[in-house]
Design a protein with these regions (language model features):
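Noncatalytic, beta-rich nucleic-acid-contacting surfaces in large DNA/RNA-processing enzymes
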Residues: 1-196
Length: 196
């Protein structure tokens, strides 16, 4: 039966094998090489398409599971998936405004960025998320704080019966300019969190 599945449904079979071994980076690396040998396309993690485990998308490519990224827990993945049902995330600001930030901590965000999980949203490259704009705080940390403040004000406006409606608008933060990482640096950081 296994040989039949591997021969007739190779992408689905390998997605299941990868999901079954996703807690062991060495095994994931081994099976990713097997996918490459079989000619299967494996796409990196993506907050707009990935699930907790490895899956096969409409183009018959295997999508890396966010649960296989080191430091990204099930709670973070579940809140990302739950809130993208409305529509895909369009920017880091859209993401931090919508998801439950109690479930997705700073480390989860950092590792998602390093793994390429936010590459599909907006025109922010990975180095920009870690840019410290002279104040010792990364742009990613500022974005998370922005989302927390936005949610806090939204919740307090909803729970206060006698308060006047807040017309407070939130301008997205300025995305810092900086050099992109070289491919070597980007791949090295990616390997730290996904094993390949």
């Amino acid at each position: 039966q296994t040989a039949y599945l591997k021969a007739h449904y190779p992408a689905e079979y390998m997605a299941a094998v990868l999901s079954n071994n996703m807690n062991d980076i060495k095994q994931v690396t081994f099976f990713m090489e097997e996918c490459r040998r079989m000619g299967l396309k494996v796409l990196g993690p993506d907050v707009n398409e990935s699930f907790y485990k490895f899956t096969v998308n409409d183009e018959n490519a295997i999508r890396f599971g966010m649960g296989a990224i080191k430091g990204v827990g099930r709670g973070a993945v579940e809140t990302i998936i739950e809130h993208r049902k409305e529509h895909y995330y369009t920017s880091i600001f859209d993401l931090v405004k919508r998801i439950d930030l109690r479930s997705a901590n700073k480390k989860a965000f950092e590792n998602l960025v390093l793994a390429g999980g936010l590459d599909s949203i907006a025109s922010v490259h990975r180095a920009q998320y870690f840019n410290m704009d002279g104040d010792g705080v990364t742009f990613l940390e500022k974005a998370i704080r922005f989302g927390a403040k936005y949610q806090e004000n939204l919740n307090s406006a909803q729970t206060s019966l006698f308060s006047e409606a807040t017309n407070e608008t939130y301008q997205d933060l300025t995305i810092p300019n900086c050099e992109s990482w070289t491919n070597l640096i980007r791949l090295k950081k990616e390997k730290e969190v996904v094993g390949i």
